Amino acid sequence: MDSNSRLMTFRRREMVEKLKLSGIADNRVLAAFLSVERHRFFDKESQEYAYADGAYPIGYGQTISQPYTVACMTSLLVERSPSGKVLEIGTGSGYQAAILYALGYRVYTIERVVELSEKAEKLFSALGFSIMCRSGDGTLGWPEEAPFDGIMVTAGAPHCPETLLHQLALDGSLVVPIGAHGLQKMTVFQRKKDRFEKEVFSDFAFVPLIGREGWG
């Protein structure tokens, strides 16, 4: 292991300790954050920022979310839908999908920006991660592969995309930030036999969800 690899490993461990202090308690989630090399999802000139607890721009008006945000969303999903097939809306850098893959999910991910989708797909291949990628309008989901045990939306929606709700399996969970531009409430919907149960959590700030059932 060279000096840079040792430094990145040290910073990744520091990041996980900070997540623990911030209230992330699920050991499966913490182990996934320790195993996935977050710096691989940054361009080389930006890797020094990979383990800081902040969002970072990745081009095309998109960002890689701060570690705490990723950990919070992941914990909400794992608690309710601990295994199975999951769909991510908004591939971005690919980091969130990689965390889900490390947790043992079968992962499908959709990205609106073709260039980001292609970049993430190449990185997944290089890392040996079997993650299914496509580009397109994520608000419409992936009907050919539905139903999903979990769906995670990594952009701020004005309301819950109805199409995604109906691509959930029974007892499946949808994690989505809902609200105005710049500030949303993390929201979880769980599909029951005759209804959808809804839970609302803390405030977060995401880039807008663009699509037919998003911000247009």
From Swiss-Prot:
What reaction is this protein's catalytic activity? [protein]-L-isoaspartate + S-adenosyl-L-methionine = [protein]-L-isoaspartate alpha-methyl ester + S-adenosyl-L-homocysteine
Briefly state the protein's biological role. Catalyzes the methyl esterification of L-isoaspartyl residues in peptides and proteins that result from spontaneous decomposition of normal L-aspartyl and L-asparaginyl residues. It plays a role in the repair and/or degradation of damaged proteins.
Q: Which Pfam families match?
A: PCMT
Any one GO BP annotation for this protein: protein repair
Q: Which family does the record claim for this protein?
A: Belongs to the methyltransferase superfamily. L-isoaspartyl/D-aspartyl protein methyltransferase family.
What protein does this entry describe? Protein-L-isoaspartate O-methyltransferase
Q: Catalytic center at which residues?
A: 65
Task: Give a yes or no for keyword Methyltransferase in this entry.
Answer: yes
